[in-house]
Swiss-Prot record:
Function: Hydrolyzes oligopeptides such as neurotensin, bradykinin and dynorphin A. Acts as a regulator of cannabinoid signaling pathway by mediating degradation of hemopressin, an antagonist peptide of the cannabinoid receptor CNR1.
Cell compartment(s), UniProt: Mitochondrion intermembrane space; Cytoplasm, Cytosol
Protein family membership: Belongs to the peptidase M3 family.
Transit peptide start-stop: 1-37
Binding site for Zn(2+): H497, H501, H504
An individual GO BP term: peptide metabolic process
Organism: Pongo abelii
One GO MF term: metalloendopeptidase activity
InterPro entries, per the entry: MetalloPept_cat_dom_sf, Neurolysin/TOP_dom2, Neurolysin/TOP_N, Pept_M3A_M3B, Pept_M3A_M3B_dom
Underlying gene: NLN
Protein name per UniProt: Neurolysin, mitochondrial
Entry annotated with the keyword Cytoplasm: yes
């Protein structure tokens, strides 16, 4: 997400909500107010600073606003007949680059800084700048001049990407309501500011949540010793268990004590329940009202207009069709799990209640994997020490995409455990960008897995290219004494997925910042990263990624084959859960009178066949609702149709490490960024329209 669990925060997408709104700026003749901001007007290097104090963040935020507004005001005073491509469209793009890079240094620290005051200042900067974004995006005088440019400019003489920039600018202006009466514009502006603040607060609440539970060793039954040894002790015989992923999932998957799992699941799905429920009750009606004012039936209709799906009817049909196809598989998997539970309750002397509870699901899905394929993830992870996985991952991407990575020594980073790499084209030596790896959990750090686009790869005013910069932020388990961080196979998959977003950010080479990196349709953005997950299900690829942390021995061929064969395990229930989340998201953004917790519970029962725990409110913990995926969570499944089609029709057929296919993928899918529509890129790559055949096969189904 971007993230597997949250919206990946991409180059022009904000954790606080929707895409960064159109910043209608003008420039070359009036750029002087911004010259003092940074040296990045004349260089393509990484200019990002991570040592700003709270006071500096506040001061630079105000300076950025004042200086940028001076440019906007100058544009607004231009005579309507004076507008040209150079003094409007191109200059707008030049200023946009400056603003994006400076803003990154101000609002990214809220997600990664260990300093509470810095995080607070960064969050306030994000709110302040988001309000400013909205103000500037709704400048009617700027919009009028852009419309005038379209009417008078000889479009045949400008590059296709520039025409796209012009068309998107006008489209976004209309989606902001700039063609409507001033009174309506002001109403929309006010609501957008409030929505932005609510989104920022929603995810801040989740990031800052420090809930933990305390258990005795007996209550952590069947959890491995290395996990228990890594826990903070409370008194002499109690252990502190947080709700962060490195604690939550091991407990839910391996702890044999039902009451422990019940308490964990209850706590996890009541995080920020009170405050975030209130936020949703305000946010959802505001979105609906803005959509109505703009002429759309629902907020879902509003956001889907810009996606490859285009309409709520297509999304609903896709989800309902997939749900029906998976229904028999889900029923069979639930029956198997229920039999496992019944037998275990008999063996351990537990009361058998005859149903699968929410806190049973991960536990018995793990047992299913172990029984059917003899795979013990705790044993398997000993072959995935993070250093070996990282080296194998980097080598795979370098070989596949024709790149070389070099670690930067003495790099300027936000934490001592963060590393920085430079990316070069292997054939030419050209520097394409840099990426940070922030792999381990810290207090108050962003608690999911995501790629953050930090600096856009685009053209600068002097014609040189600014390098793209991205950060991969995840939360793998910390190394402990005598033992490195060991990754479960699903964490290796997450690593590959998120690094796929990093490569999209780095390899895209566009003229305009707005189209750089992962700034594509929301239901297409996961395609490149999902496609690259296939490498962790290939025997030869897995050999490159693994080595026992003690003696360097390889995984046995037998175990590798079992691991690859296990890919379809629990796929029915896992996919049905994704459908549940997608349906909840669609429902809440088409009917604001619905209660979020009740809607989630309804779909859990109807589609997943596993009841939500009474008293929980999972949507209040669902960061995607306020993280840029509003009405668009379906995109994870939708985009897999495309990613699987690409993989099976090209890589699986020609060889997954075939450098020619890898370069084709880099040039036709990654390099264009958002300068082309996603469907056009797919057609260029596949040489045909995409279909669902490979996707259905990946779910254990057959195309009708």
């Amino acid at each position: 997400m971007i993230a597997r669990c949250l919206l990946a925060v991409r180059s022009l997408r904000r954790v606080g909500g929707s895409r960064i709104l159109l910043r209608m700026t003008l420039g070359r003749e009036v750029m002087s107010p911004l010259q003092a901001m940074s040296s990045y007007t004349v260089t393509g290097r990484n200019v990002l600073r991570w040592d700003l104090s709270p006071e500096q963040i506040k001061t630079r935020t105000e300076e950025l606003i004042v200086q940028t507004k001076q440019v906007y005001d100058a544009v607004g005073m231009l005579g309507i007949e004076e507008v040209t491509y150079e003094n409007c469209l191109q200059a707008l793009a030049d200023i946009e680059v400056k603003y994006i890079v400076e803003r990154t240094m101000l609002d990214f620290p809220q997600h990664v800084s260990s300093d509470k005051e810095v995080r607070a200042a960064s969050t306030e900067a994000d709110k302040r700048l988001s309000r400013f974004d909205i103000e500037m995006s709704m400048r009617g005088d700027i919009f009028e001049r852009i419309v005038r440019l379209q009417e008078t400019c000889d479009l045949g003489k400008i590059k296709p990407e520039a025409r796209r920039y012009l068309e998107k600018s006008i489209k976004m202006g209309k989606r902001n309501g700039l063609h409507l009466p001033e009174q309506v514009q002001n109403e929309i502006k006010s609501m957008k500011k409030r929505m932005s603040e609510l989104c920022i607060d929603f995810n801040k609440n989740l990031n800052e949540d420090d809930t933990f539970l305390v258990f005795s060793k007996a209550e952590l039954g069947a959890l491995p010793d290395d996990f228990i040894d890594s826990l903070e002790k409370i008194d002499d015989d109690k252990y502190k268990i947080t709700l962060k992923y490195p604690h939550y999932f091991p407990v839910m998957k391996k702890c044999c004590i039902p009451e422990t799992r019940r308490r964990m699941e209850m706590a996890f799905n009541t995080r920020c329940k009170e405050e975030n429920t209130i936020i949703l009750q305000q946010l959802l009606p505001l979105r609906a009202k803005v959509a109505k004012l703009l002429g759309y039936s629902t907020h879902a209709d509003f956001v889907l207009e810009m996606n490859t799906a285009k309409s709520t009817s297509r999304v609903t049909a896709f989800l309902d069709d997939l749900s029906q196809k998976l229904k028999p598989l889900g029923e069979a998997e639930r029956e198997f799990i229920l039999n496992l539970k019944k037998k275990e309750c008999e063996d351990r002397g537990f009361e058998y209640d005859g149903k699968i509870n929410a806190w049973d699901l991960y536990y018995y899905m793990t047992q299913t994997e172990e029984l059917k394929y003899s795979i013990d993830q705790e044993f398997l992870k000993e072959y995935f020490p993070i250093e070996v996985v990282t080296e194998g991952l980097l080598n795979t991407y370098q070989e596949l995409l024709g790149l070389s990575f070099e670690q930067v020594t003495d790099a300027h980073v936000w934490n001592k455990n963060v590393t920085l790499y430079t990316v070069k084209d292997k054939a030419t030596g050209e520097v394409l960008g840099q990426f940070y790896l922030d792999l381990y959990p810290r207090d108050r750090k962003y608690n999911h897995a995501a790629c953050f686009g930090l600096q856009p790869g685009c053209l600068l005013p002097d014609g040189s290219r600014m390098m793209a910069v991205a950060a991969l932020v995840v939360n793998f388990s910390q190394p402990v004494a005598g033992r490195p961080s060991l990754l479960r196979h699903d964490e290796v998959r997450t690593y590959f997925h998120e690094f796929g977003h990093v490569m999209h950010q780095i390899c895209a080479q566009t003229d305009f910042a707005r189209f750089s990196g992962t700034n594509v349709e929301t239901d297409f953005v996961e395609v490149p990263s999902q496609m690259l997950e296939n490498w962790v299900w290939d025997v030869d690829s897995l050999r490159r990624l693994s080595k026992h942390y003690k003696d360097g021995s390889p995984i046995s061929d037998d175990l590798l084959e079992k691991l690859v064969a296990s890919r379809l395990i629990n796929t029915g229930l896992l996919t049905l859960r994704q459908i549940v989340l997608s349906k909840v998201d669609q429902s809440l953004h088409t009917n604001t009178s619905l209660d979020a917790a009740s809607e989630y519970a309804k779909y859990c029962s109807e589609i997943l066949g596993v009841a939500a725990t009474p008293g929980t409110n999972m949507p209040a913990t669902f960061g995607h609702l306020a993280g840029g995926y509003d009405g668009q969570y379906y995109g994870y499944l939708w985009s897999e149709v495309f990613s699987m089609d690409m993989f099976y029709s090209c890589f699986k057929k020609e060889g997954i490490m075939n450098p020619e296919v890898g370069m084709k993928y880099r040039n036709l899918i990654l390099k264009p960024g958002g300068s082309l529509d996603g469907m056009d890129m797919l057609h260029n790559f596949l040489k045909r329209e995409p279909n669902q055949k490979a996707f259905l096969m990946s779910r254990g189904l057959h195309a009708s």
